[in-house]
Structure formats: C-alpha cells, structure tokens
Amino acid sequence: FFKIVKILILFLLLAFVGAGFYAGNIAYETLLTAPWEKILGVTKHRADLSRMHSREEKDGWQPVEIRSADGTKLHGTYIESSRESPYTVILLHGLYQNRSMSMPYADMYRDMGYNVLLIDQRGHGESGGSHTTWGLRETDDLDAWTEWLREKDGGVKIGMHGVSLGAAMALIYSGTEKGKEISFYVADSAYGGMMELGK
C-alpha cells in the first residue's frame, strides 16, 4: 500500500513541476512577444493624437516619420522656434503615453527659444513596435532621431528631456558613444531600477 502511495505522490509531484514549467514558458513567451495592450489592457498610449494633429495643421508644426536601425517606423513632431536658434530639445514621454503628453514641456522650451522635437517612443503613439524594449532598441531610435536633426541642421546643439520611462531612456542613452554628444539631459522622475515599475 505504501509503495503505491509513494508512486502516486511522486507522479503528482512530477505532474505539478511539469505543469509549472509549461505555464512559466507560456508566460515568458507572452511577455516577450505580446503587445502591452494584450497583457495589461492598456490602450491609452495608442489613443487620441487629434490634439497634436490639429496643432500641426494650425501652427505649421512638422510631422516627422523616420526609420530606426531595425526598420521600425518612428513618428514625431518638429516645432521650430519663433526666433532663430541652434538649440533643439528632444522630448521623451513616459510609459503608456504618447508625444501629445509632452506638449506642456514643448511650450516651456519654445518660450525659452528652443526648437522642439516631440517623439512617440517605439510601441507608443503612432510609432511602430508592439512594446518597449527597456532601452535595448530605444538607443538606436534616439540615434536615428539625433541623426535626423543633424541632417536638418548641421550645427544643431541637442538636449534631451525625458519623463519617467523617457527619463530612463535619456539616462541610458547618455552612456552611449553618440549620447555623449548631447549638450544636456533632463531626467524627470526616472526610476532607479526595474523593480520600481511593479510598485
């Protein structure tokens, strides 16, 4: 009798461990490949950009579309200062947001005489990609944006202002070779580590 019970317990234990590995593998694959909207039910960051589009039309702001190194389409809006300026600041929004959330900062920088580039980070707004890569591909994206600015104006001096996820991306970029060419960084409410995102 005890031999049968031991075999049954061993079988149940192996089945439980096997089911755990299977479920863990499914969760891992989902987190790597599924869009954030599917995982978290969040769609706001893909939502309404009509206010941005109306300002583009009304105020003559320039909609911009470029491609990152991996071919991902990236969208942004370039706003020229009312007075001639060699300075342009790139505004990086937070997680689950889009470039329209950076508009108050755009107004602030324009009042100080800066040109402004508001961007949708990958997986957000109108930019391609299903989710953020937490800096893995975003540094390539920022390379592409800074290159676009330098092609537009060879003498441009670039600053970068990020909020939350955008601040973290700015800090990550500051450690890259091309990131050292940026004139200044503003990191507003950056998180110190990935664990803080779960709080």
Per-region residue spans from a language model:
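Conserved alpha/beta-hydrolase
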Residues: 108-128
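Alpha/beta-hydrolase active-site loop
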Residues: 132-153
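An N-terminal hydrophobic leader/cap segment in hydrolases
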Residues: 11-67
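The serine-hydrolase catalytic nucleophile loop
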Residues: 95-108, 121
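Alpha/beta-hydrolase fold nucleophile elbow
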Residues: 153-164
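A short loop-to-beta-strand scaffold at the N-terminal edge of the catalytic core in hydrolase folds
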Residues: 69-80
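Short beta-strand element of the alpha/beta-hydrolase
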Residues: 86-94
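Hydrolase active-site cap/lid region
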Residues: 172-199
